[in-house]
Amino acid sequence: MISTVALFWALCVVCIVNMARYFSSLRALLVVLRGCDPLLYQYVDGGGFFTSHGQPSKQMRLVWYIYAQRYRDHHDDEFIRRCERLRCQFILTSALCGLVVVSMVALLIWH
């Protein structure tokens, strides 16, 4: 029989791997954004996005830009594809993180 604790840790590993994929895709999106739309790149603080002095309000602008699918009107097809991929990865990672939290609570109650 499969241990519930082992299953929980496997779920955590899958969640961490998907988070790494998400951040890697976000970094690649910012590189594409710098080339195709410098004003939007500056608007979302693309240069300081992954630094300690990054501005969270500008970072949230990019998150909401992608979440609201405002990229669909953009002129660059590669940028649109990367935004679609990033949006799907964000939804998947969010669902996995929620599942980890729910399973952690279930483990605490069960054991």
Swiss-Prot record:
It comes from the Bacteria. One of its GO terms (cellular component) is plasma membrane. It is a multi-pass membrane protein. This is Universal stress protein B. It comes from Enterobacter sp. (strain 638). The chain crosses the membrane at residues 1-21, 90-110. It holds the Pfam family UspB. Signal peptide: none annotated. Its main location: membrane. Belongs to the universal stress protein B family. It is found in: Cell inner membrane. Keywords: Cell inner membrane, Cell membrane, Membrane, Transmembrane, Transmembrane helix. InterPro entries: Universal_stress_protein_B.
